[in-house]
Amino acid sequence: AVALDPRLGYYAFEYDPRFVATGIDLAPLAMPLGKAQEPFVFTDLPELTYKRLPALLADALPDDFGNSLIDTWMASKGVAKSAITPLDRLAYMGKRGMGALEFRPTRGPNIASQTAIKLAKLVESARQAVHGEIDTEHHTKAALAQIIQVGTSAGGARAKATIAWNP
């Protein structure tokens, strides 16, 4: 679990005792299971890079393209960019991140459904998002939701999507 420590202003990470029992050491140098009795907090990491998170979690944050999609989505829901926390961004990554980690909020809906996509429409919607042309019309909102579903995790300087193909 991870939560903001109000005293320090940094996010504290604590292993669930059931996970500790598995013996899987996610970050053996920085957050070893042998020291899992107390929450881990890293106030010495550069805030700009790590967003006040442990490195293990900061590595899973979306890239600039993914962040712009999340910002646009949240704005359509009336949430200002300044109100979006790193935990919100991790929650939006869900199971779509590159790597083994998955994230979910402790409260709220847990939506996990697979849908077919139209690649040509997805590419056009991604172009619109990159150029800041996403508007608030229904079809564009649906396209944005689909881009967020497949495109917030691949990382890198260019927009891309991670999709499964089953002919």
Q: Which residues does each PLM region occupy?
A:
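Phosphate/dinucleotide-binding and metal-coordinating scaffold of catalytic cores
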Residues: A1-P167
